[in-house]
Amino acid sequence: MAENFFLYYEEMDWNDHIKRAGYQIWLEPKALIYHKESVSVGRVSGLKEYFMNRNRLLFIRRNAPSALTIMVFYNYFIFVVTPRNMINYIRKGHKGFSALLLKAIWWNLTHDKNSTDLGYPLN
């Protein structure tokens, strides 16, 4: 499992790499999993917003089937998702979240897709 995701999208990245390696993904329909959302970082936190946005872009960079897919996704993210999120941050009074979103985008523009530099202080 790639260590450069840290919080979000690591299992999706792992899943895509497993499938590309020729393995099958199976489902156990009787399995029951309990997942308490946002226990480790909180429902509203800068840490969550940064890594959710950073890793969404990183996932596409690592797993998109073509450069065209990456370009289409980046355009959608920059021109639709980013303005929508910034409006929501302002509307909800989440100070500093817009800067973290821009930092997440900048990280993806300035770091290799295999970089283990998380771009966020964890201590």
Task: List PLM regions with ranges.
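Short acidic, glycine/proline-rich loop/turn micro-motifs
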Residues: 37-41, 88
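Non-catalytic, C-terminal membrane-associated alpha-helical segments of glycosyltransferases
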Residues: 47-52, 67-123
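Histidine-centered active-site/metal-ligand motif
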Residues: 35, 53
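Residues that scaffold the ATP/ADP-binding catalytic core of kinase and kinase-like folds
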Residues: 4, 36, 59
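A short, conserved alpha-helix in the catalytic core of glycosyltransferases
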Residues: 2-32
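Mid-chain, well-packed structural core segment of small domains
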Residues: 62-63
